[in-house]
Amino acid sequence: MSDSAEMQQPELLLKSMNKLNGYHPQLIIPKKTLFKCDLDDKQSRLQVSSMHMENSGFLTEDEKRTIEAQKMKKRRTAGLRVAFIDPESQQYVLELHKWTKSYAFVKGWNKVVDKNDKTFKVGDVFSLWVFRCGGVNPVHDGVNLSGGHADSVVDGLEQGSLCFVLVPAKVSVHDGNLPQDSGHDGHNDNLPQDSVEPSSFFDESYELNHLFFDQEDSQGYLPDEDEDFGFNDDGSIRDSGHYQ
């Protein structure tokens, strides 16, 4: 059994797994801090470090190929479609993209931010979990969900698809429940906390996705990786007009 499976699993994760017949839960990021750039509707993405995503080993070979194919094309092509559950148990379908030095949840992230605009704040800390979705449980909380449901994340997703759960850190990871190799500050030594401001995490400007409005995307923006941009002091991506 994995370290994350042995940990106390948060209630939000367990409820989500029950509703979606989930299996193989795994803690991906013990501490993910929201920065200004994560909540900016013009950047329209939740960015996470490659170290967490790749060291966790939860991606299948087919999923890796899908993500790598999207990265190599460096165009606004589809990434890996995944389910995503916010702290209020609201469900979405997002795309997971791989950039040069990070991964990002895009194509729908703006909707997550809009739905949580009263609760998401810069500096909030969450943990990010993932499990495999086996399909909607026909009966959940006394409600019959058979025959499809408007809120079903499996609509359009295959069984076995990834489902990510964003859990407020105060109810997810506690010092006494961390893996044995974790440090006293509440993070796994093998999976460093993803709470470093992007502007200080990277010392060089690096190829991030400049964002263009997609008229067919009601969620806002899709990335294009043809240009090289750096970070502002607040962690936001420098606009080309200000990049020297």
Curated annotation (Swiss-Prot):
Query: For bias kind Basic and acidic residues, which ranges apply?
Result: 235-244
Q: Record's GO cellular component, any one?
A: nucleus
Query: In which domain of life is the source organism classified?
Result: Eukaryota
Question: Where in the cell does this protein reside?
Answer: Nucleus
Checking InterPro entries in the record gives: At2g31720-like (IPR005508), DNA-bd_pseudobarrel_sf (IPR015300)
Q: List the keywords (alphabetical).
A: DNA-binding, Nucleus, Transcription, Transcription regulation
**Annotated DNA-binding ranges?**
49-147
Q: Please provide, alphabetically and separated by semicolons, the GO molecular function terms listed in this UniProt record.
A: DNA binding
Cite the Gene3D superfamilies for this sequence.
DNA-binding pseudobarrel domain
Please give the residue ranges the record annotates as the region Disordered.
Answer: 175-196, 217-244
Predominant place of localization: nucleus
Q: Which PANTHER family match?
A: B3 DOMAIN PLANT PROTEIN-RELATED (PTHR31541), DOMAIN PROTEIN, PUTATIVE (DUF313)-RELATED (PTHR31541:SF56)
Q: State what protein this is by name.
A: Putative B3 domain-containing protein At2g31460
State the organism named in the record.
Arabidopsis thaliana (Mouse-ear cress)
Question: Mind giving the lineage of the organism this protein is from?
Answer: Eukaryota, Viridiplantae, Streptophyta, Embryophyta, Tracheophyta
